[in-house]
Amino acid sequence: MLITLEGLDGSGKTTVWEALHDVYPDATFTREPTDSWYGEAVDRSIAADDADPLAELFLLTADHADHLSGTIEPALADGDLVISDRYSDSRFAYQAATLAASDVDIDRPLEYIKGIHAAFSRPPDATIYLDLDAREAAERAGRTNKFEQDGYLAAVRKNYERLIDAEPDRFVRIDASQSPEAVIARVEEVLSELLGE
């Protein structure tokens, strides 16, 4: 089973992901961007305010393709539980906001990006969405890069809402404004239900 953790920067995904290592020690834990050379290129692009939005999208997509073939698919084939800190929904939400705010002439960026992935990507079995207001997310994240600004995160949050509306049965929304301990406890409950424990 592939479980993904999604939400705005600052929502606590990584904190939850790290806490789950103790609860599911035999699971395969992974994240996007990865630590491969593709992921390193993504990190460089994210840090650059002048990165071309289409080039950045395709760097992220290349990292995802490599992640699928090198980590996700082999782990699933072995029957592992896979828990990923970010996955394709991050790309849909974030890069659609980036493209919409750019000079790139794409009418429906979210649908465009989903279309690129449809040919090769594997959707998650379930997605835990850590929901947090854009302003609070930006404050928590520290506003250290172009993806951590209030206005941008508000657009990203709207894209996440569109994704949830399109597939409500796949997403489980958790209020991330609670304490980290409360969020972690709720995620553990949700995972237990999803895994039939």
Curated annotation (Swiss-Prot):
Name assigned to this protein: Probable thymidylate kinase
GO-annotated biological processes: dTDP biosynthetic process; dTTP biosynthetic process; dUDP biosynthetic process
Annotated source species: Halorubrum lacusprofundi (strain ATCC 49239 / DSM 5036 / JCM 8891 / ACAM 34)
GO molecular function: ATP binding; dTMP kinase activity
Database matches in NCBIfam families: DTMP_kinase
Enzyme class: transferase
GO annotations of cellular component type: cytoplasm
EC number(s) per entry: 2.7.4.9
Catalytic activity: dTMP + ATP = dTDP + ADP
Cited InterPro entries: P-loop_NTPase, Thymidylate_kin-like_dom, Thymidylate_kinase
Gene (UniProt): tmk
Residues the record lists as binding ATP: 7-14
Record's keyword terms, sorted: ATP-binding, Kinase, Nucleotide biosynthesis, Nucleotide-binding, Transferase
Similarity comment: Belongs to the thymidylate kinase family.
